[in-house]
Amino acid sequence: MLEGLYKRKKTSRFDVLFYIVAAIFIVLALRLLTLQILAGGYYQAKAEGNRLRMVTMTAARGIMYDRNGQILVGSRPAYTISIMPTGKALDEGEVAKLAALLKMKPEDITKKVNDHKYGYEPIRIANDISMDVVTTIEEHRHELPGVTIDVEPLRYYPYETMASQLFGYVGEVSEEELEELKQKDPNTLVSGGTILGRSGLEKLYDSILRGTDGGKQVEVDATGRPVAEVDRKHTVPGSNIHLTIDVNLQKAAEEAVKNQLDQLRAQGIPAQGAAVVAMDPNTGAILAMVSAPEFNPNWFAKGITTAQWNQLNNDKNHPFDNKVISGEYPPGSPFKIITGTAALDLKKVTPEEMIFDSGKHWLIDKRNAEGEALGWLNFNKALAKSDNVYFYEMGNRVGIEELVKYAGYFGIGEKTGINLAGEAAGNMASPAYKRKVFDEDWYLGETFDAAIGQSFTLATPLQMAVMLSEVANGGIKYRPYVVSRIDNKDGTPKEIFGPDKLGILPVPKNIMDLVREGLRDVTNEGGTAGDLFKGFPINVAGKTGTAENAHGRDHGWFVAYAPYDKPQIVVVALVEQGSFGAGSAGPIVRDVLAAYFNVPVNKKSNDTNSKSNKETATGANTANGQKPQNTVTSGQPRKD
């Protein structure tokens, strides 16, 4: 009996053990079933993901050509250094070695890697690496697991700073931008490493210039080092665009600006910057566009350093601004073209009427520079000598309402419509503007100031070019443009752009002929630019100007077209805090015209202190109960 009881207990123990073992095998079998069958696809994909990497291949951006087919902006092959993510923490020693080879800070590399959010895509660390550095990295490859070297197209600006605000710059898409783009469109073609246009034409035409990135699927070893290419999707280059810019004229304008700014600064004149635009008055095509100071877009293409960024961002002269389209300045004496047109057209004065300049106006104590009195003047002589007393009287006769109307005919206070981002509209002084902004009455003295391009009036250099083009071409207003053609992928034309007529100046030809004659005499002997153009072989019509600046020294203007009888080109120059227009902006315009017509220049003709270079003007005052102005006029005499 005891023996039977013992056998039953023994059997029970074996039964329990059997059931336990059986249960374990069942659990293992179920787990194996899950791994191999139910979740097999998931784990196979994960294994493949650890073994295979998709490497983005950046497409070459489209080329920007000048009007004659010369390359302005292109791409060139360059070595790039990337790190292939392994899912493991970075080795500090390896990071330090790579940083030393690339002359980077280790923390900058670590930040790039830590900020990376998109799985196993390579992380670009540095662009445009020299062959010497590439060779050294190859020699230390065993010490730098996961580091890869590729050849990619790098955006290249062969003329460096030339027309940098116009061309713009590019940069790699950031992690934040990429995440935002993928949220908006999960099928976006933008991926890690894609190069985007950031400013200027690069940004405006980014979708055309960018093209389509490709990629290659590579097999990597345990260290993340590529060992074989599995598949490849080829890139599709971006489309090319053709500009109206003439590279030779652009270079001449750039050189003229640099030389003149250097000369002015050497004379103690703190000229801060400049803007120059050359335009075909018969089409609106932009031939050259300079805004100084400039920046080097190659810095951004390679990956701008903190020091470089701080240098540009802290520059008080705003190198990123395209001052041709966004800089707003009092137009000064070139506005007398509009005042004179209005006075003649409204028959407020005849060309022959003589007005006596005693050095100041007889209604309000507004004076010429240094109290200079020019005596009896008709319209032609007043415009050629830029006499303010004469044009104060024209403002008095015409009135502010008519001045506003005629300024509108010439585009003052409205955008030109050029297809560039950031264009400013400027402003035309008026009682309505003063009431809206200051809630104050308008005074006659402000009409006088508006008549000579002061008061609240502001204009961009491009607006002044459009205004002068209307004068030069007989009264047609054209929309300025800088892109003449967009190509298909095969290089054939896709879109062609040309002259766009916006309107006709409602002023008779005989009136405009009188204005043009006055502008011609500006550059002749006795005119405010007579010394500047003495001996110049092309007959030039122009206008000097010195715009009062409430924040420092006066700005200098010069606007011109040539030849006088059959205009081919309009050139406008503005020198910030350059003082008298004839001596600051004038030489720039003269040199650009000389380059365009391929004629020599007599540099000795530039005499900034000669009598013919003076322009008469005054600031606001309180004579006859007139209220002082709130802005822009300084109250000091000024010259052209």
Q: Positions of the model-derived regions?
A:
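Beta-lactam-recognizing serine transpeptidase/beta-lactamase-like catalytic domain environment
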Residues: 2-5, 11, 73, 219-232, ...
